[in-house]
């Protein structure tokens, strides 16, 4: 029995009536500005592996752009007591972080000798100088005035980073929402110097404990607490994979930006963004 001949590829496309002429129409590449996007990878070394290094960091910056978009929208929604949209946005941020965690697996295919060959071409450029990442840190509440300095050479970038530094963080707005819900949040947590890191407060923990003990009554508040927990959990995983990837590639050498490298990154693992939400789990 002879097999039925398959339809020619050209005929399939014709039958589907696919748009093929883009002389006067916007194409996929036009919409995404792919010429500019794919022209932005400009290795400085002759090393094959530099393309991996560049693409890893550029794609991370694109995901961070989306993170900032979602975080700012989530903060605005919480300010307006629009919790359902905020939940969707915060869940998306957590998923973006999962994507960024998995991306470390690709960079980890670079061996120590391969990185050492391209490292001299990086000069003092380092990931901690990322102005998008710094805004994310500030919006999540990890305020550090010293980290404004790497952006002082660009007034436009400094203005962006400073705006995030001086604004209430995601957690600050979450606490304000609890207060508007009738929960006993101390005034010191509601009106303070937003440029300072948040410090845990027993009264704030009591407010969150009330939410978790009466979750049916405070369902939106409870869901907000869990979305924040998801986000910080994902952020911690990203930080951890950052540490382990750097350690397997450069060991304990100093970072290109002048930090102690892995030692510095390990210190960042100790940062807690939403302290009472974690502590209440012990006290429930």
Swiss-Prot record:
The keyword Transferase does not apply. Binds 1 heme group per subunit. Keywords: Dioxygenase, Heme, Iron, Metal-binding, Oxidoreductase, Tryptophan catabolism. One of its GO terms (molecular function) is tryptophan 2,3-dioxygenase activity. Gene3D superfamilies: 1.20.58.480. Its cofactor is heme. Heme binds at residue 242. Substrate binds at residues 53-57, 115, 119, 256. It catalyses: L-tryptophan + O2 = N-formyl-L-kynurenine. GO terms for biological process: L-tryptophan catabolic process to acetyl-CoA; L-tryptophan catabolic process to kynurenine. Its EC number is 1.13.11.11. Pathway: Amino-acid degradation; L-tryptophan degradation via kynurenine pathway; L-kynurenine from L-tryptophan: step 1/2. PANTHER family: TRYPTOPHAN 2,3-DIOXYGENASE. Heme-dependent dioxygenase that catalyzes the oxidative cleavage of the L-tryptophan (L-Trp) pyrrole ring and converts L-tryptophan to N-formyl-L-kynurenine. Catalyzes the oxidative cleavage of the indole moiety. Belongs to the tryptophan 2,3-dioxygenase family. Homotetramer. This is Tryptophan 2,3-dioxygenase.
């Amino acid at each position: 029995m002879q097999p039925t001949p398959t339809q020619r590829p050209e005929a399939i496309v014709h039958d589907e009536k696919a748009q093929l002429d883009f002389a006067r129409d916007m194409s996929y590449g036009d919409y995404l500005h792919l010429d500019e996007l794919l022209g932005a990878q400009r290795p400085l070394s002759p090393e094959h592996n530099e393309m991996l290094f560049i693409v890893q960091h550029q794609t991370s910056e694109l995901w961070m752009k989306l993170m900032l978009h979602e975080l700012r929208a989530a903060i605005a929604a919480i300010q307006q007591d629009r919790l359902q949209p905020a939940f969707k946005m915060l869940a998306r941020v957590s998923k973006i972080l999962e994507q960024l965690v998995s991306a470390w697996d690709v960079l980890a295919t670079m061996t120590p000798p391969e990185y050492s060959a391209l490292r001299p071409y990086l000069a003092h450029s380092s990931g901690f100088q990322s102005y998008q990442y710094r805004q994310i840190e500030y919006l999540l509440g990890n305020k550090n005035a010293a980290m404004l300095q790497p952006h002082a050479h660009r007034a436009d970038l400094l203005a962006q980073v400073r705006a995030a530094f001086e604004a209430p963080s995601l957690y600050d707005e979450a606490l304000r929402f609890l207060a508007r819900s009738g929960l006993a949040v101390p005034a010191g947590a509601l009106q303070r110097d937003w440029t300072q890191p948040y410090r845990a407060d027993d009264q704030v923990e009591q407010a969150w404990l009330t939410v978790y003990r009466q979750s049916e009554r405070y369902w939106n508040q409870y869901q907000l607490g869990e979305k924040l927990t998801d986000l910080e959990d994902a952020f911690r995983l990203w930080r951890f994979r950052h540490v382990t990837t750097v350690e397997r590639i450069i060991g304990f050498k100093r970072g290109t930006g002048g930090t102690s490298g892995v030692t510095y990154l390990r210190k960042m693992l100790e940062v807690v963004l939403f302290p009472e939400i974690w502590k209440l789990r012990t006290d429930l």
